[in-house]
């Protein structure tokens, strides 16, 4: 009987901790001879209860600080939360755990001595301690306000649980950028085609945007946008403005009767005049103008007006056509040619006695091939014997000899004998 009863109580004590009260009541009804065994069982119950509570506290340790204060009464919560608020801020950072435990042990009030075993075990579990997310962090901060009562904390806790976390911003290499780049490239190509079709230059677009929308852009900026040479950020800023201008420019000529605001000038006022398109004249009209040009190449203003009325053309177009046709006629009839040098003739050599004779001119040595000889007669001027030589008898040496012969008639025969005669004459012998 004595041996079976302790076995029965041990089986009941190894179960759930909640059965400890039943074990105590049954143990009180045991005989007086088993008092010593009852004391041992009571100690075993207390140790098992303490072990279970320690396991529960260790398993729920990350949420211990944020959930523990909510179970306190409303009067005691304000003071306890004020002291736990710096504790929460310090425990959230894993790098300061060893210093935090010593600091908290020195400043913990008497009512919170139960937290000391948990704080002492923090340095051994640094690897398992994680930073809380946005929701629990906001919850603990809302609980830590000293001025709030227990009833007023509930809406703050509910609101903090529904707060959205930080949105993920796509990086520069995300999936959205290629789509935007394709759209920008397509818009730039379409914008250029529609701008040329409307007859506006890049400078006109920049000037119009400055007057219409207050953002003045240069011709270079519009050109770089069409060539996709701007940065992605600048092109994204410029696209809506250009798109708005393009829509206004296309809707303006199609609906001229539409009323525009007084603060917005019309496109004709902005641009002054569009780029004039190339004039195309039909074949029959061109033949008529050619016939009129053959009759009168330079008509007057009245005649130009009459021709323009007959052909249903603008007067300025007819005037410009006649001006261009005259310039074309000058290019056809007066080609540019190199000027021809006039021939150089030798002076006549006349003897003082009046007798007509021919004087032989010594040959002139030159670097050009061929020699030129000329004969002087009263009725014939000296000309080059060969047409391809291009060298006349008016070289400096020949002219000097001719001048000497004309000035000194007595020495004409001497000079006409040539250099060979002078060097072989007895007077030159030394």
From Swiss-Prot:
Listed Low complexity bias regions: 129-139, 251-267, 355-364, 374-390
PROSITE patterns assigned to the protein according to its UniProt record, in alphabetical order: HOMEOBOX_1 (PS00027), HOMEOBOX_2 (PS50071), POU_1 (PS00035), POU_2 (PS00465), POU_3 (PS51179)
Tissue specificity: Expressed in epidermis and hair follicles.
Single biological process term from Gene Ontology: keratinocyte differentiation
Stored InterPro entries: HD, Homeobox_CS, Homeodomain-like_sf, Lambda_DNA-bd_dom_sf, POU, POU_dom, POU_domain_TF, TF_octamer
POU-specific domain location: 176-250
Amino acid composition bias (Polar residues), ranges on this chain: 23-32, 67-78, 392-413
Positions of region (Disordered): 1-40, 60-81, 129-180, 248-267, 355-413
UniProt subcellular location: Nucleus
Reported function: Transcription factor that binds to the octamer motif (5'-ATTTGCAT-3') and regulates cell type-specific differentiation pathways. Involved in the regulation of keratinocytes differentiation. The POU2F3-POU2AF2/POU2AF3 complex drives the expression of tuft-cell-specific genes, a rare chemosensory cells that coordinate immune and neural functions within mucosal epithelial tissues.
Subunit comment: Interacts (via the POU domain) with POU2AF1 and POU2AF2 in a DNA-dependent manner; this interaction recruits POU2AF2 to chromatin and increases POU2F3 transactivation activity.
PANTHER family named among the record's database cross-references: POU DOMAIN, POU DOMAIN, CLASS 2, TRANSCRIPTION FACTOR 3
Descriptive protein name: POU domain, class 2, transcription factor 3
